[in-house]
Amino acid sequence: MIHDNLLLIISLLFVVSMLTMLSEKIGVSYPIFLVIAGLLISFIPGMPHFELDPDWVFLIFLPPLLYGAAWNTSWKDFWHWKRPILLLSIGLVVFTATSIAYLSHAMIPGFTLAMGFVLGGVISPPDAVAATSVLQGLKVPKRVVTILEGESLVNDASSLIVFRVALATMSTGQFVLWQAGVDFFTVAIMGIIIGLAIAHVLYLVHRFFPTTPSIDTALTFISPYLMYIAAEHFHYSGVLAVVSGGLFLSFRAHELFSYQSRMQTNYVWETVIFLLNGIVFIMIGLQLPEVMTGLTKYTLLEVITYAVVVSVVTILIRIIWVFPATYIPRILFKSIREKEPRPSWQTVFIVAWSGMRGVVSLASALAVPLMLKGSAFPHRDLILFITFVVILFTLVLQGLSLPYLIKWLKIEDDDENLDEQNAMLNSRLATVSLDYMQSNYDGEIQEFEPFRLLKDRYTKIIEMADAKLFHSEENVSKAFVLKYRKMLLEIIHIKRQEIQRLRKERACADELIKIKERELDLEEARLRKSP
């Protein structure tokens, strides 16, 4: 049994890797391609049944995926765009859940309003991985990606809270609006507090205990599970616990990790996140047999009609919400008009169109209990089918059309000039490096050609000379080589100090800061590995 399960997992990982390579070859976003591939594979006769356990999704997959997203999100950018992020991740989630609740209640016979809120809570959160993977490499404003990623960090929590409140209402038969509101904010705020508390403990562990790159990497994998399980144990939001803790530790990462830890952690996490996302999306497609089970109470025309109507309305709801939420605050508040550039309607439409649903929706639908008060949960199979169609409909229609839509709308990147920021960043780093050389190695600059060459490069505001520079000097002494390497390592340290000053000044985009940190990590790794 164990052998069979292990073989199944390895086969699944292999298939995910192969299909992802194929998606890169044909130019289709891999989440969309994997869902379609999984759907086609499910039709193959004799294929084993892949059951997606919602407990596995929420406990095994969701914490690291959320933590990885939070880790790669700039807190500065998240806070800067907090208004549109919260309007989408909380306001739009509640609006979508409410709209779908009343629509399904009116359209489907026997579908109560509470059942409608269960369905609305299930399908309300978009999946950012699908959207950002489509947008990757396309010419869109950076703030669009930032807002979509920020939305995804919070909307899962909002939708799951709505989902739980709806289930509780069906179980008790009672719903009090003010109590639901209090519960909503209590669950959210306490989840954030628990996440930050655990993050502070982990910060102290990383900062003051002797660790190695392997230990640091292991702790980063343990962290999201600690945050999620602790919050869920007390019936608070595990999602927000992971997100808040991940944002805090990411913001403090430069204080905690050595260059070896940063490099190892980044490489390992990139691989793990890719595999988890790949498994999740192909498993969505493989769920068709499970979804079709139990639909005997309805005709095929009925279930398809319900699912397509809900899918179309779900897309329209986002469009209807996004445009007023973007422009009305600008009309009402002068401060917003002064601080933020006016977004074009094309850019706003891209945000509105990037509402593809994903694994959280399917896992929530599967988490709907089989029994309610001793009898079968009403319309559970229909809720599951509608959710599957909404996921497939939005992923295929919106996901495949998004690149062409961006080209057709001729969207221009009107964000701040990152090239200018990058030039300034290089200039600042070159300046502090040159100052350090002249203060501490002035004699060597006058005596040795490599020192003079490096000084000239900094003077011209170019990158630090490659570590192999001293390898080409065959006639220099071992002492010179060691001293030259020592100087380069010291300059890297000086550059890191300047980067932290720039981070505090908020003079550059965080993405540029992180890229530069990785470059310095690679430079240091090459130097320390040199004989």
Q: Where on the chain are the PLM-derived regions?
A:
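Transmembrane helical cores of multi-pass secondary ion antiporters/exchangers
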Residues: 1-418, 483-484, 499, 503-516, ...
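Cytosolic C-terminal regulatory domains/tails of membrane transporters and channels
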Residues: 416-531
